[in-house]
UniProtKB/Swiss-Prot annotation:
Domain Fibronectin type-III, chain residue ranges per copy: 787-878, 880-972, 977-1075
Protein name as annotated: Peripheral-type benzodiazepine receptor-associated protein 1
Skewed-composition ranges (Gly residues): 742-755
Stretches with biased composition (Acidic residues): 1251-1265, 1324-1335
Domain comment in the entry: The SH3 and proline-rich domain is required for the interaction with TSPO and the second SH3 domain mediates binding to a proline-rich motif in RIMS1 and RIMS2.
Described function: Required for synaptic transmission regulation. It probably controls the recruitement of voltage-gated calcium channels to the presynaptic membrane, and modulates neurotransmitter release.
Domain SH3: 649-716, 1616-1684, 1755-1822
Sequence segments annotated as region (Disordered): 57-97, 281-318, 560-628, 726-785, 1084-1107, 1163-1219, 1243-1302, 1322-1476, 1492-1617, 1704-1755, 1812-1846
GO biological process: regulation of neurotransmitter secretion
Length: 1846
């Protein structure tokens, strides 16, 4: 009987099998069992798990040893199903059974197995397989849980709970099935074997007990596992809470590893328990007793031979029947029953525990599902939040993209607006065109009518012709009769016929000569055919045309470095010339004089050029210095056309000084204008139109309007000097030779670049098919000037050893003396004169290689350049240029040259692959400009094949026609030193002028690759001065200031740059100039020294004045010329005092006309002189004159040259109605003075930076009427720079400046326009209103006409003028010598340093159309000659930016009761003989100002003009201003300040409008000055010139310069009252004052320092004061008076020396202050000239100093409303913007006191105090309280309206 294995105790892990935990203990054969051990019950136990293929981590060996023994008859079913063999034994200590019991048990087991068929086992195995698969799935899921996140773990736990529930259900089913099987087995076993019932019952009880025991143990194990699961759930909840609190970034996976470990252990325990239950349930039915004895060879539980430890069931269930003895049976049955009972109990307990575990697992599964749901919700929430974050990022990105798109769309909108504006302007132009077309249609109809009339008339004529033919037939018949009569006289007539034949032959010869000349002249046509004609001489051959004020060819040094370095094509290029001068002819308009000063300076500079190491080292294209030196003369570049064609438009060459985009300008038709690029050349046709525009053409062929103030005329001398040698004479007939000016954009030759980039040459047709050449011959290249060369060399026939050549003669008429033919540079053949242009060259080896054949022409002028006519012949000959080399190399330019393979071809030039303008035929050089220093370049020269002509094989490939060359420009070094340094006497005694020739700089301002910043003047190696202008050419120094120069021997000049200074220039001796400078001055015009911050000297030249009748042959050193003998005689008489003799206006007009006639008479005389004497004569016939900065003396010369000229007597007692009289004596000298004035006016027109004023247009109208420029139109010191326009007058041949560069520099440095007409500078709205008022109040006379019976009075600087509608009269005056000496600077207007450069790199406004001239404005222009500009200390620097307006005045009442202000003068002091001059020269009598809210107005009532000529005005007179009233009339309120009010144009980049009187602020730091301009009204066509920005040179810190002082003697200060002033700012006269003697005569002081002042300020705005024991001048705009009650307090203050800073801070505005001004409360006023307004009422004299305003006026406050936004940092041009208050429109600002002189209130806003501009405020002005109630509002509004600025 098989032995049943015993189940191990629960928890006994040592007895477990390796495939089950815990393992079942086996019953061993021969061992008994302890009583109480129950075998497990089959019923209710879970099925055994199939462990086949499973590996468990835990295993333990069974206790004891296996009893050996063979096993036989194994159970096949057990083997197949993989169940453990029952024969396997596991020893258990303490358990053993006897042999009988084993036999009984084996037998029982055999019976028990009967009926235990295969079917239940298969089902169990199937269930076990499913369980195995589920276990595998659970294991995989468990592994996935380890790897996955916590939510996945919860899902797995939920799934495991479901699996546990399923397993529990399966376990129940298996248990029920096991019970059924047990019952069946018990019936089967008990049926065949009769057993006592007690044994069976005992067995059943034992099994039941065993089962109950097993179940209890299983339940306890499951309970433990439930506790573990609960702990795991708690941990899961904790983890879930952490996850919800911390989020993704938190440490939610902190204990995941422990959790996974615990979960695995729990699952393993559950599986272990389930397996244990299953194994018990499986083995309990298999316990029948084993049969003992030999009949049972194998025992159950015996280990198999090959597999120890495995039990194999024996297949002896059916066969042997074992019969046991009765006692043994009973004993065995009892044991089995007891064991069975135990097993049953154990099974029951395990079942209960399993059910509990199942319930527990279900609960855990539910919790796990809830946790997983929560986790899933959190995951979903997390994903949703992350999605929202992603969406937010996406939205931000889209927002940024939308912003970019919005910006782009905004830009597109702006461009569309601009385009729409352009289209609108085009539409308007099209409307004009349509209107014009309608007019044309009407005209066409009219022409058709006229045509019909003409046709009828033609029929009548034809009828008349028919009648005439009939009459002719009749006459013929009569003729036949007459012939018969004449035959009789035929013999007598034959002699006459022979005579006539001789005359005919002579006429034929003359005609042939004329035809030849005509042919030659066609080759050199006039100005109408410039673009297709040649330059050079006219058709007169060797006979030059007469000269007339033409440019004299400048002497050039052929080998000089300047010629090497100047770029060909640049205006300053000077090419070698022959002795024959360039031939020019007169054109139809007046010509300018020759550049006399330039020619003279060249005569002296040529000496230094030889010795200078580098004269012009950087050949840049558009050098500022060279361009400004270009004399703007009217001499045409080409020969004049015949008389019949003189009326056509002539062509001139202009240079664009600034870039200009018409679409950015204000004009309505920008498409009709040409865009300009700085440095570009433009062809100009005809004269300037009334709008200030030229008709021009660019190099690319585009034509349109060109603003005249953006371009500058290029003089003929410079053009001729830039031409190639064959172009400067009459040698070449090709058309586009002038187009070299367009090369490279700025006059640069091929490869040159302008500032706007490379410009292609204009496509022009040449008669011979030649291409353009942009470069003149470099030094040493090309033949000498004016030597024609042969053209178009060709090979007629080529043999093996000979070649036949032919060429064309030079097209110019030249005395040919033969030809030389060279082969490879060797002379091979010489041809004599008159030989045909052919040659046969023999004995030439043409097969070995190419030979270079060239032809040289031998003429009377010399030999031509053989390379101009050359050709390569022989084997391998081609067109490729050879010997490509660098001819000259600098840091920024390079010249290349080559030997052309065929001179008939043009050559394309490439630089770094970029195409440059080509070199035309017969040119073998090119110049590259604007290169970078130290840069590698590659140049390529390619021969261009003509489109039609013979081609050779291989010519189609460019590489067969090109040669390349690489070069590296020189590195940038120090700039070059200036040339031609000279120390000369200045234009007045005590003034020394140091002049030099500025270095050549390009458009970027660089020389030798570095930027030029200025020049430094050294005296014997010690620096004495710096000039901060790269284009400055001279500087004036006062001898008394430069004591160092009196001890030194020579002066040198160095060029300054950021990288250092250049080497010294050639020194210039000082002693001769010092000796001459100390002599009395002749006709001299002082040139100012610039302000320290600008430091740009103004050029000044002092050429002599000569007479045309004395052509001097030998030039005199520059600046030391004397006058001619005739003038010297006059000059020797000295000035004499003569009473003024009045003259009528008619006499004045007659004098002007006589002068203009004399000028016209002089020009032909000059032109008829020979070419040789013209240059020296013009060089000697010069007059010392201003360089564009000093106001010339109208109608007279000045200084010692002033002879017995007519003068003006000072009008005493206010007698203004007496007309200004003209002396009849010395009219010749006065006419000469007119010439001088006119020339000065023309000089001032050289600058393209000047304003094209409406005033100038009026003068042009007057000029057209009178034929001469009126003396009133002279150039003012304040910067009335008038540029040259088409209608300029005949230039004066006696006055010329050193160079246009100096004129331009001077004009740049001058202050803004000070003396202009009211129309020019008045506010547009105000002007319109005033015009309306005038139109209402004076319906009689118009604005452009005036009754001659009402003479118009005006003050001239040194002279007076009385204007009439038809033109001004001339009023020369003769000042006294002493007066001239004392007031020399007053007369000449020496302005030192207060010139402000307005250029800033861009031009001024374009001109507007003319308007009807106002005679009053003519007088206004005459008022300023002696004004502040004309004095040595004209205007404090505070107001340099302002443009006060001086309007003309007229005496007498006009209809409507509108009184014109008159003028009155009084001079209580000063010597009587000087009264006539002093009264006119005093700034007091020449400055008319508006004193807003001043006592002058209040006292004057209706107002009147009082022009005081007091030599020493009091403080009450605000800088020479007169009390001015305002006209009564309806109040007109300006709608608001202009957008450009106080805008810093140099910062905002907005166009600055010139011409307006800017009421600048003068109270806070002195650097504050408004620099604004006027917006001119549109002309009829609506076109305006482009508005430009003004550029104000910044000052260092907040310092400013003191005004210049006049040399007047101050009265003794001991006799004057003592006053105490406090310094408002630091002042160092050495660095801040423009006066030459500032260091000696002016006092330095610091801010807050107390100064002792004696008396009142002088006419120049300076006090005489004392500081630190030193006495000197103190500028009034730098100090303020301290109110002191007693002399003791004054002395105490002076002992203190300084005021505390807090006192100065409190005194910064109009608030409480310890100091006060003598004129207005608050900060002291600055001497300024404000805008003049028209006055009502008779002329009144200023009663005296105005009374001080009561202190109550300072304390009065009133609220005012801001009308506009104002930000001082954006809208204020002043330097101290922190002193001004920012505010918004609508803010209520409390203002204190009255408005200051600058239009500012002192106000308070939000607790902050500062200055507030009055024209930004609304509400009644505070000045209304002091005016009459009836006019307060009107006057307030009018005051504010007048302060609106642009």
């Amino acid at each position: 009987m098989e032995q049943l294995t015993t189940l191990p105790r629960l928890g006994d892990l040592g007895a477990m099998e390796p495939w089950a935990l815990p393992a079942w203990q086996h019953w061993t054969q021969g061992q008994g069992c302890k009583p109480g051990d129950a075998s497990p019950s089959i019923a209710g136990t879970p099925t055994a798990l199939q462990v086949k293929g499973l590996r468990f981590e835990e295993s333990s060996k069974p206790e004891g040893a296996h009893s050996p023994g063979p096993v036989g008859n194994t159970d096949p079913e057990a083997t197949e199903t993989g169940l453990p063999k029952l024969g396997q034994q596991a020893e258990s200590p303490g358990y053993s059974c006897s042999g009988l019991e084993e036999e009984e048990a084996q037998a029982y087991k055999a019976k028990f197995n009967i009926g235990f068929g295969d079917r239940p086992n298969l089902e169990l195995l199937r269930a076990l397989g499913e369980l195995q698969q589920r276990c595998t799935i659970l294991k995989e899921e468990n592994q996935m849980l380890r790897k996955s996140s916590f939510p996945e773990t919860e899902e797995k736990v939920r799934r495991l709970k479901r699996k546990n529930a399923e397993l529990a259900v399966i376990a129940k089913r298996l248990e029920e099935r096991a019970q059924k099987l047990q019952e069946t087995n018990m019936r089967v076993v008990s049926a065949p074997v009769p057993r006592p019932g007690s044994s069976l019952e005992l067995c059943r009880k034992a099994l039941a007990r065993q089962r109950a025991r097993d179940l209890s143990e299983t339940a306890s194990a499951l309970l433990a596992k439930d506790k573990q699961i609960a702990a795991l759930q708690r941990e899961c909840r904790e983890l879930q809470a952490r996850l919800s609190l911390v989020g993704k970034e938190g440490p939610q996976w902190l204990h995941m590893r422990d959790f996974d470990r615990l979960l695995r252990e729990s699952q393993r325990e559950v599986l272990r328990l389930q397996r244990q239950i299953a194994l018990r349930n499986q083995r309990e039915p298999l316990r029948p007793a084993r049969s003992p004895g030999p009949t049972a060879p194998s025992r159950v539980g015996a280990p198999a031979p090959g597999a120890p430890g495995e039990a194999v069931l024996q297949d002896d269930v059916e066969s042997p029947q074992v019969v046991l003895r009765e006692p043994e049976k009973q004993q065995r049955v009892q044991q089995l029953e007891s064991e069975l009972c135990k097993k049953r109990k154990k099974c029951e307990s395990l079942e209960q525990e399993a059910r509990k575990k199942q319930r527990r697992c279900e609960e855990l599964e539910l919790q796990l599902r809830a946790a997983q749901n929560e986790n899933a919700r959190l995951v979903e929430e997390n994903s949703r939040l992350s999605g929202r974050a992603t969406e937010k990022e996406q939205v931000e990105w889209e927002n940024s993209e939308l912003k970019g798109q919005l910006l782009g769309v905004t830009q597109e909108r702006d461009s569309a607006l601009l385009k729409s504006q352009g289209l609108q302007s085009k539409l308007e132009s099209l409307e004009q065109v349509l209107k014009h077309m309608r007019e044309v249609a009407q005209r066409r109809q009219q022409l058709e009518v006229e045509h019909e009339q003409a046709r009828l008339s033609l029929q009548e004529k034809q009828e008349e012709v028919r009648r005439l033919q009939q009459a002719q037939a009749e006459a013929k018949r009569e003729h036949e009769g007459a012939v018969q009569l004449l035959e009789s006289t035929l013999d007598s007539m034959q002699a006459r016929v022979r005579e006539l034949e001789g005359q005919c032959r002579s006429q034929t010869e003359r005609f042939s000569l004329l035809a030849q000349e005509l042919q030659a002249f066609r080759l050199h046509p006039g100005p109408l055919d410039l673009l297709t004609s040649a330059l050079g001489c006219s058709a007169l051959g060797d006979h030059p045309p007469p000269h007339c004020c033409c440019s004299i060819p400048q002497p050039c040094q052929g080998s000089g470095p300047k010629d090497l370095d100047l770029p060909p094509g640049s205006p300053g290029r000077c090419t070698p010339k022959s002795s024959e001068p360039a031939l020019t002819t007169l054109t139809g308009i007046p010509r300018r004089t020759a550049k006399k000063a330039e020619s003279l300076s060249n005569s002296s500079r040529s000496e230094s050029i030889h010795n200078s190491p580098k004269s012009c080292p950087t050949p840049e294209v558009d050098t500022a210095s060279e361009v400004e030196e270009l004399e703007v003369d009217s001499v045409s570049l080409l020969p004049a056309a015949p008389e019949s064609h003189s009326g056509g438009a002539r062509i001139q060459v202009f240079l664009a000084r600034y870039s200009y985009n018409p679409f950015e300008g204000p004009n309505e038709n920008p498409e009709a204008e040409l865009p300009l690029t700085a440095g570009e050349y433009i062809y100009i046709y005809g004269n300037m139109d009334e709008d200030g525009f030229f008709e021009g053409e660019l190099m690319d062929g585009r034509r349109g309007l060109v603003p005249s103030n953006f371009v500058e005329r290029v003089s003929d001398d410079d053009l001729l000097s830039t031409l190639p040698r064959e172009l400067a004479d009459s040698s070449h007939s090709s058309g586009p030779e002038l187009s070299f000016l367009s090369g490279g954009g700025g006059g640069c030759s091929s490869g040159g670049q302008s500032s706007g980039g490379r410009s292609q040459p204009r496509p022009e047709e040449e008669a011979a098919g030649d291409e353009l050449s942009l470069s003149p011959p470099p030094e040493g290249l090309g033949e000498p000037l004016a030597v024609p060369y042969p053209r178009h060399i060709t090979v007629l026939k080529q043999l093996a050893h000979s070649v036949v050549l032919a060429w064309e003669l030079p097209p110019e008429r030249v005395d040919l003396r033969g030809f030389h033919i060279f082969v490879n540079g060797e002379l091979r053949q010489a041809l004599g004169p008159g030989v045909p242009p052919k040659a046969v060259l023999e004995n030439m080896d043409l097969r070995t290689g190419p030979l270079h054949v060239s032809v040289q022409a031998l003429t009377s002028k010399g030999s031509s350049d053989p390379l101009r006519c050359c050709l390569a012949v022989g084997a391998g000959a081609g067109v490729v240029p050879s010997q490509l080399r660098i001819h000259r190399l600098t840091a920024t330019s390079a010249e290349i040259a080559w030997v052309p393979g065929n001179s008939n071809l043009a050559h394309a030039i490439y630089l770094n692959g970029e195409e440059c303008p080509p070199a035309r035929p017969s040119t073998y050089w090119a110049t590259f400009c604007n290169l970078r220093p130290g840069t590698l370049y590659q140049a390529r020269v390619e021969a261009q094949i003509p489109s039609q002509g013979p081609w050779e094989p291989g010519w189609e490939r460019p590489e067969q026609r090109a040669a390349t060359l690489q070069f590296t420009t020189l590195p940038a070094g120090l700039p070059d030193a200036p040339l031609d340094v000279q120390a000369e006497p200045g234009p007045s005694p005590g003034i020394l002028m140091i002049s030099w020739l500025p270095v050549t700089i390009d458009a970027a301002g660089t020389s030798n690759g570095v930027r030029v910043t200025g020049y430094a003047i050294y005296a014997d190696g010690q620096k004495i001065m710096e000039v901060a202008s790269p284009t400055a050419g001279s500087v004036l120094v006062e001898v008394s200031q430069l004591q160092l120069l009196q001890a030194c021997h020579e002066v040198t000049v160095r060029t300054m740059s950021p990288h250092g200074e250049s080497s010294d220039s050639i020194p210039a001796p000082v002693a001769p100039a010092l000796a001459s400078a100390c002599q009395p001055a002749r006709m001299s015009c002082l040139s100012p020294r610039p302000s320290p911050e600008v430091r740009t000297p103004l050029a000044s030249v002092s050429p002599g004045l000569g007479d045309t009748s004395f052509p001097l042959r030998h030039p005199v050193p520059h600046g030391t010329q004397d006058f001619s003998a005739s003038l010297s005689i006059e000059m020797s008489k000295g000035p004499q005092e003569e009473p003024p003799v009045p003259c009528s206006q008619e006499e004045a007009g007659a004098a002007v006309r006589s002068i203009s006639e004399e000028k016209r008479a002089i020009e032909p005389t000059l032109g008829q002189e020979g070419p040789e004497p013209v240059a020296p004569s013009l060089a000697k016939q010069e007059v010392e004159c201003t360089s564009g900065d000093a106001g010339p003396v109208p109608c007279s010369t000045q200084g010692e040259l002033t002879q017995k000229k007519p003068s003006i007597e000072a009008c005493h007692g206010g007698d203004l109605d007496s007309g200004l009289k003209l002396r009849s004596e010395k009219e010749d000298m006065s006419e000469l003075g007119v010439h001088l004035v006119n020339s000065l006016v023309d000089h001032s027109r050289n600058s393209d930076l000047s304003d094209i004023q409406e005033e100038e247009e009026e003068e042009e109208e007057e000029e057209e009427e009178l034929g001469s420029r009126p003396c009133s139109s002279q150039k003012q010191v304040a910067g009335n720079s008038i540029r040259e326009n088409g209608a300029k007058p005949q230039p004066d041949p006696f006055c010329e400046t050193d160079s246009d560069e100096e004129i331009l520099e001077q004009i740049l440095e001058l202050p803004l326009q000070r003396l202009c007409s009211k129309k020019l500078f008045s506010i547009p709205e105000e002007e319109e209103e005033e015009e309306e008022e005038e139109g209402l109040e004076k319906p009689g006379p118009s604005r452009t006409s005036q009754d001659p019976s009402q003479p118009e009075l005006a003050l001239l600087g040194p002279g007076c003028d009385s204007s009439q509608p038809q033109g001004p009269g001339l009023c020369p005056l003769s000042p006294e010598l002493s007066g001239v000496r004392e007031h020399l600077e007053d007369v000449l207007g020496v302005v030192g340093g207060n010139g402000r450069r307005r250029g800033g790199g861009s031009p001024e406004k374009l001109p507007n159309r003319k308007r009807p001239q106002d005679p009053r404005e003519h007088c206004s222009r005459l008022l300023g000659n002696g004004g502040p500009q004309a004095s040595a200390r004209p205007v404090p620097p505070r107001e340099r930016g302002s443009l006060p307006v001086i309007e003309g005045t007229r005496v007498g009442q006009e209809p409507g009761g509108r009184g014109r202000p008159g003028l009155s003068r009084r001079c209580p002091r000063g010597p009587a003989p000087e009264s006539s001059l002093v009264s006119c020269l005093s700034p007091k009598c020449l400055e008319i100002s508006i004193e807003y809210d001043s006592e002058d107005e209040q006292e004057a009532g209706s107002g009147g003009v009082s022009i005081n000529s007091s030599c020493y005005p009091t403080d009450g007179e605000a800088w020479g201003t007169a009390a001015v009233g305002r006209p009564r009339g309806p109040p007109k309120v300006n709608p608001g300040p202009n957008a450009y009010l106080r805008l810093p144009a140099w910062e905002k980049g907005e166009p600055e409008r010139r011409g307006r009187s800017a009421i600048g602020r003068t109270k806070e730091p002195p650097s504050r000055a408004t620099e604004t301009g006027e917006s001119r009204g549109q002309d009829n066509s609506g076109r305006r010139g482009p508005q430009r920005r003004g550029a104000r040179v910044p000052r260092s810190g907040t310092t400013e310069l003191a005004p210049p002082r006049s040399p007047q003697e101050a009265p003794p200060h001991q006799d004057l009252p003592v006053r105490v002033f406090v310094a408002l700012f630091d002042y160092d006269p050495v660095s801040m004052s423009p006066n030459p003697d500032a260091g000696e005569e002016e006092l330095p002081f610091k801010e807050g320092q107390l100064l002792k002042v004696f008396g009142d300020k002088d006419a120049d705005g300076f006090y005489r004061g004392e500081s630190g024991g030193r006495t000197g001048y103190i500028p009034c705009n730098m100090v303020a008076e301290v109110a002191v009650d007693s002399p003791a307090g004054r002395q105490q203050l002076l002992q203190r020396g300084f005021l505390p800073p807090n006192v100065l801070t409190e005194a910064s505005g109009n608030g409480p202050s310890v100091y006060s001004s003598a004129h207005t409360p608050g900060p002291p006023p600055k001497p300024r000239r404000s805008k003049k307004v028209e006055l009502e009422g008779p002329t009144q004299l200023c009663p005296g100093p105005p009374k001080l305003i009561h202190s109550a006026a300072q304390k009065t406050s009133r609220p005012m409303v801001a009308a506009f936004d104002y930000n001082p940092r954006e809208n204020s041009p002043n330097m101290d913007v922190e002193a001004e208050l920012p505010f918004r429109a609508g803010d209520v600002i409390t203002v204190f006191g009255n408005m200051d002189d600058d239009g500012f209130y002192y106000g308070e806003l939000n607790g902050q105090r500062g200055l507030v501009p009055s024209n930004f405020l609304e509400g009644p002005g505070p000045e209304s309280g002091s005016l009459e109630s009836g006019t307060s509002q009107a006057e307030s509004q009018r005051t504010r309206r007048r302060r609106v600025q642009c």
